[in-house]
Amino acid sequence: MSNQRRDFLKVSALAGSAALATPFISSQAVAAGPGAGAVRIANPEMAKNMVVLNYKEDNQYILGVKTDKGILQVAKAAKQFKVKAPVNTDDLIANGDQGLGKLVLLALNKGKAALFLDESKIEYAPAVTNPEKIVCVGLNYAKHAKETNNPIPKLPILFNKFNNTLNSHNGVVAVSKVNAEKFDYEAELVIVMGKRAYNVSEADALSYVFGYATGQDFTARDLQQRSSQWMIGKTNDGFAPIGPYILTADLVGNPNQLKIEQYVNGEVRQSSNTNDMVFNCAQIVSYTSKIFTLEPGDIIFTGTPEGVISGYPKEKQVWLKPGDKLETRIEKLGNLKFTLT
């Protein structure tokens, strides 16, 4: 790590800058929402008890729901039962359940088998496709701050990515096209906002959250370290894989009690728990909402635990390269896989 970057981190910190089981919906356990209609509203009634995803079909992003029969094709189910339904996760988050819970029950109990896809055969899309904001939190695990020789932050250190970074489960990160050499992983829990939040309290903050997903804040360290601003090392195309799913908040429970791991070519590199966060999810949402308004669909990468390559002694730093296969695992949320080319 350059002295320039280390000095910046210290100033910012002090001044305030094994496959895991994933729940699915069964015909006995679907919460039917009230339906919010097609008009976008600021605070829709959020869907509950669902594992949702986007998949690609005919150059479109289509909403799927993970069930015990496979991935429900929501659009085809809506057509069969002649009802309206959200078209993708962005629509679901922005406009609420829109009767999706009832539709899933109908499909499970009366739908044709053709409505359900084998999960191994779908082409995933990013779990959120068009957030207004992608917010990231730096140095938010105590042991990670220690391994990089930085003090524990006094306030959350916020930075951002852009939508060009969004990537999917089973996706590809084309590092060979990036003018950099020091590629690094960062396993991260992602918060998906469900309601407009401005100046919310810590006590209420998580009630504004739609759900959670597995994410990866992929980074080019040599670009990141060129200046005190991290952006150019964080915003390359495809540098923010997220997925496979979003679990609604009620299925996750306490987001700060989840095992989090990073694997590279089958070798575990990071192994921690979200309880090591310096600022927990409620604190992050509350703090961020006091800086700017969070909108439904905004996503927050909550920081990475210890074990990143940049935290190793220099003689042990072996940077990622084309051909490497990465897998990010977070308890309950599923395993996010992608390959470097």
What are these regions (language model features)?
Residues 58, 65-70, 193-195, 265-266, ...:
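Short acidic-glycine loop/turn motifs at beta-strand connectors
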Residues 129, 136, 184-186, 295, ...:
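Residue-level recognition of short, solvent-exposed, well-ordered loop/turn junctions
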Residues 40-43, 53, 124-126, 146-149, ...:
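A generic local secondary-structure boundary/capping motif
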Residues 5, 10-12, 31-156, 325:
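N-terminal non-catalytic cap/leader segment that marks the start of a structured domain
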Residues 66, 152-169, 185, 320-331:
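Structural signature of FAD isoalloxazine-binding scaffolds in flavoprotein oxidoreductases
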